[in-house]
Each structure stands twice: as structure tokens, then as C-alpha cells.
Amino acid sequence: MQSYVRKTFTIGKKLTYKVTACSKKVKTVTVIGSKKQLKSITIPATVTYRKMKFKVTEISKNAFKKQKKLTKVTIGNNVTKIGANAFYGDKKLSKVTIGKNVTNIGANAFYGDKKLSKVTIKGKNLKKIGKNAFKKIKKSATFKVPKGKAKAYKNMLKKAKTSSYKVK
């Protein structure tokens, strides 16, 4: 089974994954991109490859950088990390939903996504928002966060040099 580690595969001619762990107990993959420009991306919690079920735990750096058509992204609940520049410069991206287990959003992850106006963060365990992760997004962007997390997430967004925004 270990021979699958670092192997890449594409599901449904859309998203491409790289195997990061493959044992009897742990099977994980990282999303590394897509073969073509997509309008909407839903990153699932799990994918099946060769009759094995893998948890999707990460979005790699530069995975969806400069997608010209992308307007909406939904990130599954097993993803814990969004890599640096993952959605950098996606000029039409307007809505992002971040799954409940993301703990780390990389530097410049959504930098320059000028139409990004609505970000929903479902999780209560976000530990780090990288530098400029949400810089140069729409000026009136709204971040919807879990109850009791507004202050902590607001501080992280400020440290990350986020453009003007509202947290609710």
C-alpha cells in the first residue's frame, strides 16, 4: 500500500489529488489542482481511488492559482490546511465556505481575489491565517464565523493584514 504514496490521480476529469499516506489505518490525499478551469469547486471530505477511501486533508500551495472562471469554493470537513497561494488571483471568486477542521490558512491563500465578498468559516479550531491571506479582496467582505470566535478570528485577520472587512 505504501507504493501509492506520492501517486497522483484525477477524479471525474476535475480535481487532481496526490496520495500523502496509505496504510491500513491512515489514507490521506492532498488536492493539487484541476486539469481545467472550473466555475465552482467542492473539495470533498473523502475520495475513493482503486477501491480505497482517502480523507482529503490539504489543499496544496498554488493548487487553484489564477483560475479565470472560479466563482465559488466549498472546502470539505477533513481539510486541515489551505496552502500558500492556493486561490491566489482568482479574480471572479466571490464566495468561499471553509470546512470545520481547517486549522491553517497559508500566506496569500486568497490574495487578490477582488470579488471575494463572503467567507464562511465553519470551524472553531482555526489557529493561523497566513500573511496577506485575504489581502486585496472586496472592501466590504463579510466573514461569518462560529459563535464565540469573532474576537479571536478578527485578531488573526488583522495580523494577516486583511483588507477592510466585517466579522459576524
Write out the residue ranges for each language-model feature.
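A recurrent domain-boundary module in secreted/ectodomain proteins
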Residues: 1, 160-167
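Short beta-strand/loop segment at the start of cytosolic alpha/beta domains
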Residues: 2-34
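Consensus positions within tandem repeat domains that build extended binding/scaffold surfaces
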Residues: 60-62, 83-88, 106-111, 131-133
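A structural signal for leucine-rich repeat
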Residues: 132-136, 155-159
